[in-house]
């Protein structure tokens, strides 16, 4: 049975509402992400997540309203199935609760509105208006009588809805107007000649009728409506802003900025502290504007002022204290500070970022020695980025101290139960800091000095501080400072217990007890690094590319072991792993490698050497004291953490990529467990013990469409939108951009011809060349009828060079490698090319039904996904491309991937997914040529790309085997796996019990939500929803017990509650 869960949940925000939802004294922001509502509190100039609610439907709009006698606002949610319901905050249970359960306003005989579903609330809280179908409005009256509100049980906040007809069919936008006598609305629409008009209506709730009003305006620009508190309405067009009302003649303002179109807008609520005459608007290019309207008795003057640039907005929410929330589909959503919004000096400041990786047009899995990373082509237009998603350790900054030039630092606990001393080592000085139990910092002048500090620890039972600088060894007992001054410069040092070891210039290693010398050892070359372990063993790295092991005891110092390396050791750390008699020696080299030698009983375990390349420059190794694991920091171009988990080495990235050095730091009063520094600051931080997904953003010129990679570079196909301010014309330019993996910087690019759009890219088998497919999209053509196949290779001086070019008759929509051949989907055909001796030639081709969208291959099959006609199975036999099977159902495919032999996974534009089977053993030829539908279900999002890959390797006892990874338009990454024959019955029963025991929001059915949705029918779902099953882990014990026992007419499961928790924990290991 197919098992689907989220690796990364949807992050695109298309709708948001600002209201007093949780209590009457504080503000909340509620955002909608596909089928999830997130409730945030607005406190201390930040948005903090309170809770989230998974809705078993796709949310198309959400609005707030305040029922009579309710101290808080309720929200009404409209879904894509033309239904609505309401939610409110239950103060007794501190949770989101159902108000009115699902109400259906669908009419199958009517045509859907071209403007999409519109949900509107009357400013005076009298009615809610829903526009779904052409020529029809659904009116939902809000209770205004307290007596009727108290006696109503079925609909505690709203009356039954009724429908009214309007003449306008092609509606552009609708707005509820400020009219105190009757609920009124303005309708912006197009007539049959595409001329834009505005009409107004008044709603008669008692008679359930709608009457035309006398405020009309003809032949205006198409745009967005914003109601004014003066009773009129603003129309934001492409060139003009109009004001239309009954009292003032039509006024218009010529826009002074080259704006293509206004998208979202917001009228500022007086309670937010902003002038009610000021409106914040955004255009499709991501620019924010302040629009101000000043009214006199008969006229209105309008001003438009640019504020700055932000993410391309899907929704705007004005907040108190000149703050603005920008919800975005194309980039990160942000909380902005708009200082002095009523004055002329504006500066946008980002206060908070909400990561969004939507829309994902393509992605790859990049596997290296540090683990797997997902690299996505995200965003669009100016907001295009590459997003690198890693399963990494998160580091949360608690406090930042601005300081530059830090070389190293140390922390020690001196006669305290916390780390009360911090040493900051700069290039030519050391600053010592004392930290009080309350977290107050003060300087210690006794330990501060005019040279760098190399090492700090405590000796003699924590009674003295040991400080090794470049000139001396110092001991401090809290009052007096004792020192041993070196005749030569000290290059490195270490200690264990009361024993101290330093290396000085000339390759001499000195041993001390305290500051009393007890022995010395002369090396052949200079010492690059050393580490004193608890077995009285010193590991010494030499500039001659050697490591020697010196044993220190009362009888003297002896050389017990040596290792010959190929590179110079630069940093050494020894960590216990096997118990008292063994451990691992970590050695970083000058070229970015980390070597690991396993030792036991003082000897290297044979064949235990492991080499991991973590960069190209020297790496600093630092031991980190953790209660959970013995961890080693590797600080280089990409800071990473190394530790063993279940006898398996784990190398995981860190969320902070600017980290230069670290130190363990335990201080309960500050709530931190580490210090780290960057080029510009020191951070007191808290490192999580649990890995989670972290997203790194790489800026791209333009927006990325396709990506592939080899061991050194990312090859990214980008498109860049250029505008001419004078003519307002736009044109798309295409590029191949090459990014170096370690630095993530662009090192080369190739510009394609005008009107040439990049469509596909693959890496060839030699791991050096890439093949790019394009199509020419000329303005006078509906579809491309020409394109090119090109082969590129990186030169020795890191330039990109075209090696071959082949012109084709159409757009190269998709490319894959099939053995040593190149398979291309070109318009309505599949072609096989061969690249030999710098030329590309056609081996064979075949026609497909309409338009090839995607191709997947295995050893003997080529699967072509069609725009309208599902998939076709092809084989390449004796230089002939032949069709062996086809799905004859109409299906608008978006991606295809081979699940297993003769089993194919297909996604379609409506959010459905189908698994198809090919029967190649049937005696009937017609059966062998016809693909059979095996499983079908609804995913809820449009899938752009599906790949056969695994982000996290499953464990041996995993209940589900991951098979595919799907990327969606709304920024989610879905894992598609197989639950196996033995696990399927239990998981299906568990899913059914959860559906029956846990009440859904709005009374929606999860079973209906996951049903396959065809043209005129729905079919039962063949799916185990991992998100539903995993969501119950945090529920109370009685509810889990009810699920196990089959409450509400469910099936009793043959497991305990503890077994249920273990099952869910097992399933959660598929993703962070």
Curated annotation (Swiss-Prot):
GO cellular component: Cul4-RING E3 ubiquitin ligase complex; cytosol; Ddb1-Ckn1 complex; Ddb1-Wdr21 complex; nucleolus; nucleus; site of double-strand break
Intracellular or extracellular location(s): Nucleus
Claim: Methyltransferase is one of the keywords in the record: no
The keyword Cell cycle is annotated on this UniProt entry: yes
GO biological process, any: proteasome-mediated ubiquitin-dependent protein catabolic process
Primary localization: nucleus
Family of the protein in this entry: Belongs to the DDB1 family.
This protein's name: DNA damage-binding protein 1
